[in-house]
Amino acid sequence: MGLWFLWTHRNTFLFRSGSVDTQNWWKCIQGSVEFYSIGLPSKAKQLKNVVSVGWEKPPRGWVKLNTDGSAMKNPDRAGGGGLLRDHDGVWLKEFARGLGFTNSILAELWALRNGLLLAKELGFQQLIIELDALSVVILMNNETENLLMEPLLTDCRNLLKEIPNKRVIHVFREVNQCADALAKLGSQSLYIFAVFCNPPPMVKSILTFDKVNMHCNRLLNS
């Protein structure tokens, strides 16, 4: 409609009046735009829910293991890290390691394996394991085979079976910030595994944040 009006208005200008009716011209353009916009598919607005998330202390007598893998690209220079805390939120042990060049899922599994080995060496019998990698949590909670991740996946499952009481839980990344910081620390060095006797500086403030049960908000699609 708008193009037709412009064409006829041009012809009128050239062959008849020689003047431009700018007011009608502009109204027609506006009407054409409105008419066109009616036909466009409307984007449904996704409602967001605000939830409060934070690291939770395990029940009395239990220990919590948080692990994470870090690979900025897929694949890329990667690292893994994790830490153990008791029912009071007291730091027990933590580790970081370089993994060379690998993808994010394998980095997550390497970090989990190292965390489970550390928990086993320390003799913990009741363990809650938290990761922010949902795909790894699903793998650990069933027996689905994945040839691309063998034998690392089998190692993790076998180590998990040696712990009498355990739970593997998915958490949001905001809950897993200590492990994330350790994984990034590990990615800065190649093939070095370090167990810390004291928390490194980059996690001290996060440990305090978690211990006093501070939460932050996260937006979720409803």
Which residues does each predicted region cover?
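Primary recognition of RNase H-like, Mg2+-dependent phosphodiesterase/nuclease domains
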Residues: 1-222
